[in-house]
């Protein structure tokens, strides 16, 4: 039994790591496809990930101690068992069961050949359940997928983990193909019994009103990451262009650090204006990050009427955030680096910056637990993020084309 428990323990240990790296693409796919993240759907898909990792580890573990694992040079067919139903003869050969004594049948659960066959059936039962319950596949598709999954497992073993090991360290067994496929079919058959205790997947999005949903900070944070990657790249490119142009005009190759800081600040101001104010005016309040996460900025008038965003709305929104808050913090950092202040002034400025960061941090933490998720620069500018509805996406794509 330990040979089966060990891979599952490894799967449980590595699952959080895999989940961490897959969370960002998972969220993006959910936002793009459904417009929001359904917690129950997330639970299903993460449980599917855990099952897939467990099944894969059960197939490949334990690994040989050495990649040079060939004891003798044999033909590939030496590592293949191609006679169907060999597991039956192996079970009958090893068993201590007396068929006329039903009480002796319990011995089967202690015998290697029977347990191995049973394991191969159980290995793919969850796959059949997922296929029918969540992916809503029919019997034929479940059969083909289960067979394909089993073939993938067997080829993984036959190729020595895709060539990492010189020789296969487990047999390619035709019985495993049959038993794994049977497991998938059993999973398909028992799904209605299990589904009676679970929500219907076709109803997960039934009562969802995207137009009334609040855009959360995780979603906005993902958009922020993509947008600021672009901002950083664009600012660097523009800074190099301006620096090169300045060097030509001044006929020098030595631009001082102070001049470079001015050029970087100038480039940042221009990029912010183009990316966050000019482009969203044309794209209906969308930047690349917002498009990826399926949100856009709208004007939220005091009368409660939502309107399309204008250039001046965007200027108020992003000038306050980037030129105001971020600009003030950058100015203090610039003074600290280039101001040549006395020691007491440096300490005072450091304290001011620390208080500034603390106040902002506390403010964002407080807003995190508030219902409306509206930040100060949005209140002042009368703007906010909303989820882009499917028809709005289609209209925007049609207009763009």
Features from the language model and the residues they span:
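Bulky hydrophobic segments
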Residues: 1-168, 185-289, 299-401
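Individual transmembrane alpha-helices with interfacial aromatic-anchor signatures
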Residues: 171-182
């Amino acid at each position: 039994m330990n040979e089966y428990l060990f891979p599952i323990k490894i799967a449980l240990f590595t699952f959080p790591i895999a989940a961490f790296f897959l969370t960002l693409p998972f969220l993006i796919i959910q936002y793009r496809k459904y417009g929001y993240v359904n917690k129950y759907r997330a639970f299903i898909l993460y449980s599917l990930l855990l099952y897939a990792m467990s099944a894969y580890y059960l197939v490949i573990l334990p690994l040989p101690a050495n990649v040079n694992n060939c004891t003798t040079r044999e033909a590939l067919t030496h590592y293949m068992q191609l006679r169907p139903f060999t597991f039956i003869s192996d079970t009958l050969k090893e068993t201590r069961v007396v068929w006329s004594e039903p009480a002796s049948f319990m011995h089967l659960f202690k015998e290697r050949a029977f347990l191995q066959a049973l394991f191969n059936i159980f290995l793919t039962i969850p796959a059949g359940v997922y296929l029918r319950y969540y992916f809503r596949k029919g019997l034929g598709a479940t059969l083909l997928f289960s067979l394909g999954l089993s073939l993938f497992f067997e080829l993984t073993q036959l190729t020595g983990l895709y060539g990492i090991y010189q020789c296969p360290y487990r047999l390619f067994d035709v019985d495993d193909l049959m038993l794994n496929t049977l497991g998938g079919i059993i999973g398909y058959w028992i799904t209605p019994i299990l589904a009676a205790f679970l929500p219907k997947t076709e109803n997960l999005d039934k009562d969802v009103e995207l137009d009334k949903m609040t855009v959360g900070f995780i979603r906005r944070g993902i958009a922020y990451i993509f947008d600021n990657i672009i901002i950083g790249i664009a600012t660097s490119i523009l800074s190099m262009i301006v620096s090169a142009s300045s060097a030509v005009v001044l006929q020098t190759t030595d631009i001082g650090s102070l001049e470079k800081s001015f050029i970087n600040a100038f480039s940042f101001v221009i990029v912010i204006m183009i990316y966050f104010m000019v482009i969203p005016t044309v794209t209906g309040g969308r930047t690349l990050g917002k498009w990826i996460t399926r949100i856009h900025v709208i004007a939220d008038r005091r009368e409660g009427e939502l309107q399309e965003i204008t250039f001046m709305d965007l200027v108020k929104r992003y000038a306050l955030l980037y030129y105001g808050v971020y600009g003030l913090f950058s100015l203090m950092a610039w003074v600290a680096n280039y101001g040549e202040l006395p020691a007491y002034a440096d300490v005072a400025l450091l304290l001011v910056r620390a208080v500034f960061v603390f106040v902002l941090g506390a403010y964002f933490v407080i807003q995190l637990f508030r219902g409306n998720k509206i930040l100060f620069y949005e209140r002042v500018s009368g703007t906010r993020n909303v989820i882009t509805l499917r028809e709005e996406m289609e209209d925007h794509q049609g207009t763009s084309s």
